[in-house]
Design a protein with these regions (language model features):
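Helix-loop-helix hairpin linking two adjacent transmembrane segments in secondary transporters
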Residues: 134-180
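Cytoplasmic helix-loop-helix junction between adjacent transmembrane helices
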Residues: 101-138
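Extracytoplasmic gate region of multi-pass secondary transporters
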Residues: 21-23, 205-255
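Hydrophobic core of transmembrane alpha-helices in multi-pass small-molecule transporters
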Residues: 96-110, 296-310
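Central cavity-lining transmembrane alpha-helices of secondary-active solute carriers
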Residues: 44-61, 247-259
Length: 407
């Protein structure tokens, strides 16, 4: 339990750092500190850390398989301190500098690929869905950023939110080095990074989970980084009000993620995923009409938050059930990268479409269609993969039992 708590805290702290720029995007546009910024400029600013953190999960996941979470958690946390301090102390004077150090801030997003294999190894298969879901609730670090960054920026100074986050990252890195232990019996995989990456990429579950997570977690990331700008533009909210509502969205998704993992342990991942994508199909279609925020709009967005959170938890419950333990880190890196990239593209599309149509309807309509296609994939191909894995496990147990009887 201590290992799960420490991993979850590390994930949350790094995600807090990863999301520092997002709440400030609309504020920079409003106060003119960086000059005249377009909707696309803000979208790019908040999306750069997302794509770097996503692609970085591929090598970091493979390195975690090799060196373990006890080494990688402190390493990622300490490395993240550098861009956080740079953004707080001098980079806010230039849009270009924010993009450059936002690029390196993306390193914080790779903590996810450290935690999943680390936590997975500490729990038996029948409890991994819940355990990885609890760890995944660390994505609530983005809510901490949403609730505190603008307040600290306006109240205490532009550097303060970054200095506080950097200090917490250092404290966590030291605590992780002292307290974390890799699961007993952990063995480093054989072969080069390239050969292991290729082998993991060829697994059917890898590309299937990549699609599932690109929509579920990608949708969550897209909303968590772009929702403040969307609410500011579509509903004319203040930056603080928009950030608070985004925090509510994040909180619902965070709470539902471990519940999605637990439900997957009880009923299987496919029903949980299918229900989640169906909710997104309907919710995005409703939101596309820009309904009144105080009732229908709020219900639509919170329902999607619940669906995306539970779907994210269910995806890694699926990975844990189908993937052999020695490959979980590598597969997690690829799937996590897909999820992050799924969060990178929608803000750019939304900003581009709004800049030309002054409407978000097309972007949200595309989300609804994408979720519908993913629902079909879940009920067909993914269901078959899970059934085949269950049959293989049953056959393996029968073979082992027969061998033991002969001995």
């Amino acid at each position: 339990m201590v290992m799960l708590v420490m991993a979850t805290v590390g994930f949350a702290v790094n995600f807090w750092a990863w999301a520092l720029i997002s709440p400030l995007g609309p504020l920079f546009r409003e106060n003119g500190k960086l000059g005249a910024l377009s909707e696309s400029d803000v979208a790019l600013m908040v999306a750069v850390p997302v794509v770097v953190g996503s692609l970085g999960r591929i090598p970091v996941g493979a390195l975690t398989d090799k060196y373990g979470g006890r080494v990688m958690f402190p390493m990622v946390s300490l490395a993240t301190v550098v861009p956080v301090l740079a953004l707080g102390l001098f980079a806010q004077s230039s849009y270009l500098l924010i993009l450059v150090f936002g690029f390196f801030l993306g390193l914080a997003g790779t903590a996810f690929a450290v935690g999943v294999p680390f936590v997975n190894a500490w729990f038996p298969p029948e409890r991994r869905g819940l355990a990885v879901g609890v760890f995944g609730a660390g994505m609530g670090g983005t809510a901490v950023s949403a609730l505190t960054t603008v307040r600290l920026y306006n109240g205490l100074g532009s550097a303060v939110p970054f200095l506080i986050t950097a200090g917490i990252l250092v404290v966590y890195a030291v605590a992780a080095w002292v307290m974390l232990r890799d699961a007993p019996g952990r063995s480093a995989p054989a072969g080069s990074f390239v050969s292991r990456l290729a082998a993991n990429a060829r697994l059917p579950i890898t590309w299937q989970a990549c699609v599932l997570y690109a929509v579920a977690f990608g949708g969550y990331v897209a909303f968590s980084v772009y929702l403040p700008a969307y609410l500011r533009t579509a509903y004319d909210l203040t930056p603080a009000d928009a950030a608070n509502r985004m925090a509510g969205f994040v909180l619902v998704a965070v709470v539902l993620r471990p519940i999605g993992g637990w439900l997957s342990d009880r009923f299987g991942p496919v029903p949980v995923l299918a229900a989640g994508y169906l909710v997104v199909v309907v919710g995005a279609a409703v939101a596309a009409s820009t309904p009144l925020l105080e009732w229908l709009g709020t219900v639509a967005f919170l329902a999607m938050a619940a669906a995306l959170g539970s779907g994210s938890g269910a995806t890694f419950a699926l990975v844990a059930k189908v993937t052999e333990p020695a490959r979980v880190g590598g597969v997690t890196g690829l799937v996590g990268a897909a999820g992050g990239l799924g969060g990178f593209v929608p803000p750019l599309i939304m900003g581009y479409v709004y800049g030309r149509t002054e409407s978000y309807a097309i972007g949200l309509g595309l989300l609804s269609v994408t979720a519908a296609l993913t629902l079909v994939l879940t009920l067909t191909t993914v269901r078959s993969t899970l059934r085949a894995a269950a049959n293989d496990l049953t056959q393996s147990r029968r073979t082992t039992h027969h061998h033991e009887e002969r001995m």
